[in-house]
From Swiss-Prot:
Family, similarity comment: Belongs to the RemA family.
Organism: Finegoldia magna (strain ATCC 29328 / DSM 20472 / WAL 2508)
Protein name (record): Putative regulatory protein FMG_0656
Signal sequence region: none
Disulfide bonds: none
C-alpha cells in the first residue's frame, strides 16, 4: 500500500485516489455536502480551513488543510520512489 500524508499524521492509500481538487467551486461543494449526508465524509483538517478535497474510489471524500499542489508534490515524490 502506497500512502500519502494528508496532514497531521493522517494517511490515505494513494492508489485509491481519483482526484485532488480545490474546494471553492460549487460542484465540489455539492460533492462534499452529498458525502456528508451519506456519511462518506472524512474531515482531517482539525478545525483549519479546508484547502483540498480528495475524492477516493470508495466514494469517500476526504477534506485536508493542505494545498492541492502540496499533495501533488508529495504524491509525485512517492511515485518517484517506486521507480
Amino acid at each position: 500500500m502506497e500512502s500519502l500524508g494528508i496532514g497531521f499524521s493522517n494517511l490515505v492509500n494513494s492508489n485509491r485516489i481519483i482526484a485532488i481538487v480545490s474546494p471553492e467551486t460549487n460542484p465540489i461543494k455539492r460533492i462534499v455536502q452529498k458525502a456528508k449526508e451519506d456519511n462518506n465524509l472524512i474531515d482531517v483538517t482539525f478545525g483549519r480551513k479546508t484547502r483540498s478535497v480528495i475524492i477516493m474510489d470508495s466514494s469517500h471524500v476526504v477534506l485536508s488543510c493542505l494545498q492541492p499542489e502540496t499533495l501533488q508534490m508529495r504524491l509525485d515524490k512517492s511515485n518517484n520512489k517506486e521507480d
